[in-house]
Regions:
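Bacterial N-terminal signal peptides that target proteins for export
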Residues: 1-9
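Short, composition-biased local secondary-structure segments
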Residues: 10-11, 23-25
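Hydrophobic core
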Residues: 12-17
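Sec/Tat signal peptide C-region and signal peptidase I cleavage site
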Residues: 18-22
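Compact, glycine-rich, soluble single-domain proteins
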Residues: 24-159
Length: 159
C-alpha cells in the first residue's frame, strides 16, 4: 500500500512539473509602442521575444485599440508591403525581433492617441506544439522612436 502511495505521489509530481513547464513565460525584451498624434488611428508595437521551448505567437489584444494583429513587412518586387499573418513561430531559445520594417504588432482603430512616456498593456497569446494556448500580459512604454540600447546613445554625435 505504501508503494502505491509513493508511486501516486511521483506521478502527481511529474504531472505538476510538466504543467509548470508548459506555463514558462516567453521572455519579452526592449518592448515599446510608437507614439501617435491626434487623429492617427494606427501604430506599431515592437519587442524581442525569446521562448524557452518552441511556440507560436498567435494573437495579440489590447484595451487601447479596437483591432490588434501580428504583421510582417516584406519586399514584393520593388515595393515594401505590410500584411497580417496568422502567427509567428518562436524557435526554442532563439530571440525573434519584432521591429519597424519587419515583424511587428499592429494596433489599429486606436481609441485615443498614445502619448510619449505613457504605457500600453498588451496580451500576447502563444500556442505550443500540443495546441495548448497561454496568455501573457505585458506592458510596453510609448516612445517616439526606437529606444537606444544602453551605452549606445548617439544624440550628441555630430556628422
Amino acid at each position: 500500500m505504501q508503494n502505491i502511495f509513493k508511486l501516486s505521489c511521483l506521478v502527481l509530481a511529474v504531472v505538476l512539473s510538466s504543467a509548470a513547464w508548459a506555463q514558462i513565460a516567453v521572455k519579452v525584451d526592449g518592448g515599446w509602442a510608437r507614439a501617435t498624434v491626434q487623429g492617427q488611428k494606427a501604430t506599431g508595437a515592437f519587442m524581442k521575444l525569446t521562448a524557452p521551448q518552441a511556440t507560436r505567437l498567435v494573437a495579440v489584444s489590447t484595451p487601447v485599440a479596437g483591432v490588434a494583429e501580428i504583421h510582417e513587412m516584406k519586399m514584393d518586387g520593388n515595393v515594401m508591403k505590410m500584411r497580417a499573418i496568422a502567427g509567428l513561430d518562436l524557435p526554442a531559445n532563439q530571440a525573434v525581433e519584432l521591429k519597424p520594417g519587419s515583424y511587428h504588432l499592429m494596433l489599429m482603430d486606436l481609441k485615443a492617441p498614445l502619448m510619449k512616456d505613457s504605457s500600453v498593456a498588451l496580451t500576447l497569446t502563444f500556442k505550443d506544439a500540443k495546441g495548448v494556448e497561454t496568455k501573457q500580459q505585458v506592458s510596453v512604454p510609448v516612445n517616439t522612436g526606437m529606444p537606444q540600447a544602453a551605452g549606445h546613445q548617439h544624440a550628441d554625435h555630430k556628422h
